[in-house]
Amino acid sequence: MAPKKDKVPPPSSKPAKSGGGKQKKKKWSKGKQKEKVNNMVLFDQGTYDKLLTEAPKFKLITPSILSDRMRINGSLARRAIRELMAKGLIRMVSAHSSQQIYTRATNT
């Protein structure tokens, strides 16, 4: 049997990497500030009328959706939903401790 020859890897075309140079230190980024929303805490007549006409036409009604679209705060949105329920303009789809879902009242 002939002795084994040591295989030498072919020279690569890439230059050899130099030792780990000092990298630039990463700077701390400034935290993003959330924009403060200035929602109403009491209904004025215009917003109340808008609530009674537009909200029953929404396909999905939640306190967060009312708060966003009507520019009212969350507790006012929950009160508004209770009033719309009492008038029979909307109906409940699902209720959970943290989220209530309503929809427009249909004739069913």
From Swiss-Prot:
The keyword Ribonucleoprotein applies. Gene3D superfamilies: 3.30.63.20. Residues 1-36 are annotated as: Disordered. Transmembrane segments: none annotated. Pfam families: Ribosomal_S25 (PF03297). The keyword Cytoplasm does not apply. It comes from the Eukaryota. Keywords: Ribonucleoprotein, Ribosomal protein. One of its GO terms (molecular function) is mRNA binding. Residues 22-31 have a biased composition (Basic residues). Belongs to the eukaryotic ribosomal protein eS25 family. This is Small ribosomal subunit protein eS25y. It comes from Arabidopsis thaliana (Mouse-ear cress).
